[in-house]
């Protein structure tokens, strides 16, 4: 649910904030003791509500995803060009390359930011509500892309999703949080249960098996413990 610590958790996994207690490890070493560029070559982040610099074009923003791989001794290279090109193709934003980011729709911007994360070409990718602003088609395309990155290319992906049915369909494992605490961890069938939906979200629901995917499918029981308001 909202405010349970999902975004805070992702930020702590990318050095944006330091944990108050405990330690975050990357390859067995403290994440916060490693050089920033070294971490950025291993872990990519699509944050919630990113803001692009004024007057920047799509191609230039996506190219910034290659910054962790560059240095004085290694300027822009054909490898960078290939990574940017592949990221734009994968997210369907190549036709937007010459446009200014601030003139795009919310859904187009979200796909551009996904391209930035992909151009970074990290083995670990953290996505904070990646389907925000996207219509149903582009939501499914993005989630299918994530699945492909995992199965074909070996990426490790961690995504914050509010749609339980999408999470159940695409995730190998789900972590349910409530008020900053981990409530459940495991495969979708073990986590997406009627009792957990009631405990975490305060929603009475029926959970059945999706006949298409075989994953759990949550169907809210409106009128049974939930009050739905309609604005006027």
Where are the regions that the model predicts?
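Conserved ABC transporter NBD signature motif
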Residues: 22-30, 39
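Catalytic Walker B motif of ABC-type/P-loop ATPase nucleotide-binding domains
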Residues: 125-129
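Conserved ABC ATPase "signature" region
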Residues: 63, 78-96
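Helix-to-loop junction immediately C-terminal to a conserved catalytic motif
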Residues: 14
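ABC ATPase nucleotide-binding domains
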Residues: 200-232
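Conserved ABC ATPase signature
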Residues: 75, 100-104, 108
């Amino acid at each position: 649910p909202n405010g349970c610590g999902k975004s805070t958790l992702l930020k702590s996994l990318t050095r944006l904030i330091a944990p108050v207690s405990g330690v975050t490890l990357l390859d067995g070493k403290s994440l916060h003791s490693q050089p920033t560029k070294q971490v950025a070559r291993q872990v990519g982040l699509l944050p919630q509500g990113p803001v692009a610099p004024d007057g920047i074009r799509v191609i230039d923003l996506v190219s910034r995803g290659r910054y962790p791989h560059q240095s004085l001794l290694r300027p822009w290279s054909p490898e960078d060009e290939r990574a940017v090109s592949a990221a734009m193709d994968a997210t369907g934003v190549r036709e937007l390359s010459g446009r200014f980011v601030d003139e795009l729709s919310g859904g187009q911007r979200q796909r551009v930011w996904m391209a930035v994360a992909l151009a970074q070409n990290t083995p670990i990718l953290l996505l904070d509500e990646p389907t925000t602003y996207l219509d149903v088609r582009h939501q499914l395309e993005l989630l299918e892309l994530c699945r492909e990155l995992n199965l074909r290319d070996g990426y490790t992906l961690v995504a914050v999703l509010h749609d339980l049915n999408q999470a159940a369909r695409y995730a190998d494992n789900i972590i349910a949080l409530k008020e900053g605490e981990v409530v459940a961890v495991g495969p979708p069938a073990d986590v997406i249960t009627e009792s957990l939906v009631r405990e975490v979200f305060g929603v009475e629901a029926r959970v059945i098996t999706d006949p298409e995917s075989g994953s759990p499918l949550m169907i809210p029981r409106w009128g049974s413990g939930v009050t739905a308001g309609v604005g006027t």
